[in-house]
């Protein structure tokens, strides 16, 4: 089913790219757009995960420089029956996390330094279990390709004026009106695609993540903290790359952005309520619960990776 969904997504994005090309340059523009879209589809399948990780300057960590964080992900992956993903940290005060990769064998999970500072180990386990659920459900390919192509489509729409704004351009069948339509429709359509693939996907990952970590309340508590943090702490890299917003566990964009009129995520309170109902109703756990390291302690520092505060001071707390 995921292969069909991904194929439909690629077909829609390609058609949208061709439509914008037609509005800008007529048939010639449409054919050029088709060639570009085909190349981007191929490139994004193999490289979009690296592009996303690079956009957030994420650094890979292991048991040497982030032993307890790495151990939590390792134990959760074992519970889920997944291959061990690559583990990354990116430097941002906003608590958040995402997963990427074209399949479970080539997957990665990334957490912000702010996440490790703000959440308890149990809550971190809930968050990473949610991200592993995306990997297990094979959502990451769809998420990552959408981020890459949506960003490209939005950029093409934003620069449509420069490519096709010449009123005397005979290749443009609709003239300046066509350019204006491309500038408005392309980013909006890309945004709607992100919305369409995010809603049910997040609920499904919440439920499976709760099963993987063994306690829905860990994830419920984490979602509340992350949502409050995202509302007050900006993520500058996400603001520069809004097409990646749907990849995060909570929308990283500030409330001041117009993009939030078309939220890429379901309401956080509804997600928390669903997890609480799951806990109260007696969760059918299919895997043994993970035991979070130092469960009574809150994170006060980040691993010694050179990110955040961990590079200059000896690390303290559960992530050292």
From Swiss-Prot:
Keywords: Cell inner membrane, Cell membrane, Hydrolase, Membrane, Metal-binding, Metalloprotease, Protease, Transmembrane, Transmembrane helix, Zinc
Domain of life according to the entry: Bacteria
Active-site residues annotated for this sequence: 131
Signal peptide from the UniProt entry: none
Entries under PROSITE patterns matching the protein: ZINC_PROTEASE
Cofactor annotation comment: Binds 1 zinc ion per subunit.
Any one Gene Ontology BP term: proteolysis
GO cellular component: plasma membrane
GO molecular function: metalloendopeptidase activity; zinc ion binding
Enzyme Commission number(s) from the entry: 3.4.24.-
Region of interest: Disordered: 281-320
Membrane topology: Multi-pass membrane protein
Binding of Zn(2+), residues: 130, 134, 202
Cofactor: Zn(2+)
InterPro entries to which the protein is assigned, alphabetical: HtpX_protease (IPR050083), Pept_M48_protease_HtpX (IPR022919), Peptidase_M48 (IPR001915)
Transmembrane segments: 6-26, 28-48, 145-165, 173-193
NCBIfam families from the UniProt entry: PRK01345.1, PRK03001.1
UniProt family annotation: Belongs to the peptidase M48B family.
Protein name as it appears in the record: Protease HtpX homolog
């Amino acid at each position: 089913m995921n292969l069909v969904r991904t194929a439909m997504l690629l077909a829609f994005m390609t058609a949208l790219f061709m439509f914008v090309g037609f509005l800008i340059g007529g048939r010639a523009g449409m054919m050029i757009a088709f060639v570009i879209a085909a190349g981007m589809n191929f490139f994004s399948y193999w490289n979009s995960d690296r592009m996303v990780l690079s956009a957030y300057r994420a650094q890979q960590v292991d048991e040497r420089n982030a032993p307890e964080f790495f151990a939590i992900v390792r134990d959760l992956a074992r519970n889920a029956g997944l291959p061990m993903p690559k583990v990354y940290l990116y430097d941002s005060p906003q608590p958040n996390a995402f997963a990427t990769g074209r399949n479970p064998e080539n997957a990665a999970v990334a957490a912000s330094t702010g996440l490790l500072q703000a959440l308890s180990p149990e809550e971190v386990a809930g968050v990473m279990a949610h991200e592993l659920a995306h990997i297990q459900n094979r959502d990451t390919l769809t998420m990552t390709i959408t981020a890459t192509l949506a960003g490209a489509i939005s950029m093409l729409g934003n620069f449509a004026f420069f490519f096709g704004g010449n009123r005397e351009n005979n290749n443009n069948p609709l003239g300046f009106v066509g350019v204006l339509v491309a500038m408005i429709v392309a980013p909006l359509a890309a945004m709607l695609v992100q919305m369409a693939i995010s809603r049910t996907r997040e609920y499904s990952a919440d439920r499976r993540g709760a099963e993987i970590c063994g306690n829905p309340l860990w994830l419920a508590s984490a979602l509340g903290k992350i949502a409050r943090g995202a509302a007050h702490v900006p993520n500058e890299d996400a603001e520069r790359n809004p097409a990646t917003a749907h990849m995060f566990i909570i929308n990283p964009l500030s409330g001041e952005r117009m993009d939030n009129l078309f939220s890429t995520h379901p309401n956080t309170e509804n997600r928390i309520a669903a997890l609480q109902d799951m806990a109260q109703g007696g969760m059918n756990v299919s895997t043994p619960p993970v035991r979070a390291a130092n469960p009574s302690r809150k994170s006060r520092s980040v691993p010694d990776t050179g990110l955040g505060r961990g590079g200059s001071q000896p690390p303290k707390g559960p992530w050292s």
